[in-house]
A protein has these predicted regions:
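Membrane-interface helix caps and helix-loop-helix hairpins in membrane proteins
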Residues: 27-37, 185-190
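Membrane-interface alpha helices of multi-pass inner-membrane proteins
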Residues: 19-31, 79
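Residue-level signature of transmembrane alpha-helical entry/exit and packing/kink sites
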Residues: 14-21, 65, 69
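Transmembrane-embedded, aromatic-rich helix segments that form part
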Residues: 35-46
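Transmembrane helical bundles and short interhelical boundary loops of multi-pass, membrane-embedded
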Residues: 64-270
Length: 270
């Protein structure tokens, strides 16, 4: 009835997790404005996919509740950041189509490993669900007695919550890498570097999201991979990831010089 529906909507919109998301997104707006739209979209994707599973793919319920949650998050985050925004002047002006694009080989060097791991993991999960071999702790029970499900519904309902969360973050991270190849925001840079700030802000958050995903995926496949092939795959991915850490020596040296030479420390005069 209407009373139960109203209570349910209020409970979903005023969920403590939604309130915390609203606060932190408002905080992001004050600390780094770019994080405000980035994590509003990422949070929206996580909430939408979660609602799809929780409400058993009932279209109207999913979009109604997700829409109300999105409105609440936007409104509450604006209120949280309002004292700061009243005295803040944005540098960004307009959204433009990208005229220059990153060469494919450079994209592969920078992002090939995390994107390959993410999409390989998605393929593994889909294969398991189709073959009904998703046999690990946290997996929802099979719905053998129910009507035949669509492939998309079967995939979403067959994923453990942690897997769905990680896949959502991974897809969002891939989107953040690709977005500066399509559009950029006019701000403090011009000429050949007009995409620089847009690319830095988006790919920096993509790097963080990829880091969360890779840590989960490699351990997930090593512990619950199910086959030696997947365990070997995860170990190979771990070795490749460890090899990238070697670049830290070059990066630190290029910026700080010889860190073992105290006379080069600038301290407060840096």
């Amino acid at each position: 009835n209407k009373e139960n529906t109203g209570f349910s909507l209020a409970r979903e919109v005023l969920n403590p997790a939604i309130i915390l998301i609203s606060f932190f997104i408002g905080f992001f707006r004050m600390s780094n404005y770019w994080d405000f739209p980035i994590y509003y979209v990422v949070s929206g994707a996580v909430i939408l996919f979660t609602n799809m599973v929780v409400y058993n793919f009932k279209g109207k319920a999913i979009f109604a509740i997700t829409g109300l949650q999105g409105i609440f998050v936007m409104g509450a985050s604006i209120l949280v950041s309002l004292p700061f925004m009243l005295n803040f002047e944005k540098i960004a002006t307009v959204l433009c189509l990208a005229e220059a694009h990153t060469p494919l080989n450079q994209l592969i060097i920078l992002w090939g490993l995390p994107i390959f791991i993410i999409f390989s993991y998605i393929c593994f999960m889909i294969t398991d669900i189709i073959k009904n071999r998703n046999d690990y702790p946290g997996r929802p029970e099979d719905n053998k007695g129910q009507k035949k499900e669509t492939l998309l519904r079967r995939i979403f309902s067959g994923l453990a919550p942690s897997d769905l969360f990680i896949i959502t973050l991974g897809l969002c991270a891939a989107g953040l890498v690709l977005l500066p190849e399509l559009v950029y925001v006019q701000d403090i840079y011009s000429g050949d570097y007009k995409r620089a700030n847009t690319m830095f802000k988006l790919t920096y958050q993509a790097f963080i999201l990829f880091g969360i995903c890779i840590g989960y995926i490699l351990l997930r496949l090593m512990v619950y991979g199910g086959t030696w092939k997947r365990i070997r795959y995860s170990l190979a991915g771990l070795v490749l990831f460890a090899m990238t850490v070697c670049y830290a020596q070059n990066a630190v040296g290029a910026w700080y010089g010889n860190i073992f030479k105290p006379s080069g420390y600038e301290g407060l005069d840096a």
